[in-house]
């Protein structure tokens, strides 16, 4: 009986370890966001930049009432891991004519920031970041 339970125990341990790593990355992303993004962005209210809650999966340039550059409004993309990584690496190279003059040079910080932004777009019950904000 013990031998039969071993694969299940290992699977549960691996899942718990992966979840803990995800939570650490989200927490790191929240710190990066607080340190580097809050000068222009908030989670829920448009400021110098548009609000960030729900950005993951949102069409670029689509927040009603926010004055986006023409380039971003016409970009025809949805924010996901790939587009956010390219955007945060070099916004002007990714979408020439956009208005954001900010980069996240560290690949690790970009990945953490993207994980945090993605967690903000998840249903509240499944989002560790939602409980912290």
Predicted regions and their residues:
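Bacterial N-terminal signal peptides
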Residues: 5-15
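Electrostatic cytochrome c docking/interface patches
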Residues: 14-33, 130-133
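C-terminal capping alpha-helices of c-type cytochrome domains
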Residues: 80-128
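Short Fe-S-cluster ligation motifs
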Residues: 65-85
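Sequence/structural segment immediately N-terminal to covalent heme-attachment motifs in c-type
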Residues: 23-45, 52
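Short cysteine/histidine-rich metal-coordination sites, predominantly Zn2+-binding motifs
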Residues: 53-59
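N-terminal secretory signal peptides that target proteins for export/translocation
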Residues: 1-3
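Soluble non-cytosolic domains of exported or imported proteins
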Residues: 27, 31, 46, 78, ...
């Amino acid at each position: 009986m013990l031998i039969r339970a071993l694969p299940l125990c290992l699977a549960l341990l691996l899942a718990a370890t992966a979840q803990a790593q995800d939570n650490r990355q989200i927490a790191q992303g929240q710190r990066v966001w607080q340190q580097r993004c809050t000068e222009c962005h908030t989670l829920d209210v448009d400021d110098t930049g548009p609000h960030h809650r729900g950005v993951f999966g949102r069409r670029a340039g689509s927040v009603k009432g926010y004055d986006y550059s023409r380039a971003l409004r016409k970009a025809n993309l949805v924010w996901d891991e790939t587009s956010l990584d390219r955007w945060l690496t070099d916004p002007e190279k990714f979408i020439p004519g956009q208005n954001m003059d900010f980069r996240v040079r560290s690949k690790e910080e970009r990945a953490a920031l993207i994980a945090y932004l993605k967690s903000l777009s998840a249903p509240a019950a499944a989002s560790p970041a939602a409980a912290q904000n």
